[in-house]
């Protein structure tokens, strides 16, 4: 019985014992090291979580050739990321396909567009792509019935890491293209390393996981003698998750395959480029 009584009274005595503060210096060293390791693990987990929500991994920036734009972008566009391009007409398509050519380099790139986009903004011309300095054999055009099919096709393309770039064209504000869908696109782009350009025709800006957002419209070309002039775009960077914003006048140079500053360009330059090897020359074809 005494053993039972002692067992019952022992916890009461312990509860009544006043607690004394333990000095910080008296904590074992192994416990301090354990806390430091736990903090490092939590920071690593947080960085991984941020990457999954659209912040791309570190990759070499893709220089556009425009000095002011590249300076604001931190060296250029970030590969393996989602970039949005908003426009109210055909000028957005021209700017987007030039960025896709730039990002794809010598690889193939996909252009996915619903059927009604071709009826509204015109069909894709291989001759026009040739005059812009690209090779029509690089482009793989995918036409879908609606925006849902276009989004599904884009996710399938992003499963292949050997694609140079992806241009996804959308009209208006379809319900399927919400914040969750943009996060999936951004995550797939980061995993595969494929740069995605989301062309939004006639749409208003809405929350998305895009790294950059551009508002684009056409600008007058420099005067020429008897040619069309090189394409010039008034491109406004309205969102940049890793840096600043800016408004740029960007001219596409087909010979060099990059953008240049209009103020530094020579006047009366020709828009007809040298034809690639083993391909016929094309002269003065409207794009």
Regions inferred by a protein language model and the residue ranges of each:
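Conserved RecA-like P-loop NTPase ATPase core
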Residues: 69, 85, 139, 166, ...
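Conserved inter-motif catalytic segment of the P-loop NTP-binding fold
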Residues: 108-164, 169
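Phosphate-binding/switch region of NTP-binding enzymes
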Residues: 198-280
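Short, solvent-exposed amphipathic alpha-helical segments in soluble enzyme
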Residues: 100-102, 126-128, 183-184, 252
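Helical mechanochemical/support elements of P-loop NTPase systems and associated helical scaffolds
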Residues: 65, 94, 121, 150, ...
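P-loop NTPase motor core
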Residues: 142-152, 156-220
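Arginine/glycine-rich "motif VI" loop of SF2 helicases in the C-terminal RecA-like domain
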Residues: 133-134, 187-194, 228, 242
């Amino acid at each position: 019985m005494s053993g039972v009584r002692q067992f019952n009274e022992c916890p009461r005595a312990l509860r009544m014992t006043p607690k004394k503060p333990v000095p910080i210096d008296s904590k074992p060293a192994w416990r301090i090291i354990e806390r430091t390791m736990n903090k490092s693990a939590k920071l690593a987990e947080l960085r991984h979580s941020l990457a999954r929500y659209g912040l791309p991994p570190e990759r070499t920036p893709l220089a556009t050739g425009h000095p002011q734009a590249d300076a604001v972008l931190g060296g250029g566009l970030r590969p393996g990321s989602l970039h949005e391009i908003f426009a109210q007409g055909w000028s957005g398509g021209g700017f987007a396909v030039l960025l896709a050519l730039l990002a794809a380099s010598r690889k193939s790139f996909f252009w996915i567009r619903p059927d009604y986009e071709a009826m509204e903004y015109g069909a894709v011309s291989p001759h026009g792509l040739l005059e812009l300095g690209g090779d029509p054999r690089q482009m793989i055009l995918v036409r879908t019935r609606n925006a849902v099919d276009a989004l599904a096709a884009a996710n399938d393309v992003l499963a292949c890491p050997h694609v140079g770039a992806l241009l996804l064209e959308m009209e208006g504000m379809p319900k399927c293209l919400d914040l969750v869908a943009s996060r999936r696109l951004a995550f797939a782009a980061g995993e595969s390393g494929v740069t995605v350009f989301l062309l939004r025709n006639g749409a208003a800006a809405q929350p998305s996981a895009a790294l950059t957002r551009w508002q684009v419209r056409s600008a007058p070309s420099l005067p020429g003698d008897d040619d069309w002039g090189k394409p010039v775009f008034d491109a406004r960077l309205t969102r940049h998750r890793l840096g600043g914003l800016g408004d740029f006048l960007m001219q596409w140079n087909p010979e060099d395959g990059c953008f240049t500053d209009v103020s530094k360009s020579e006047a009366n330059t020709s828009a007809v480029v040298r034809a690639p090897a083993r391909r016929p020359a094309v002269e003065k074809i409207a794009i």
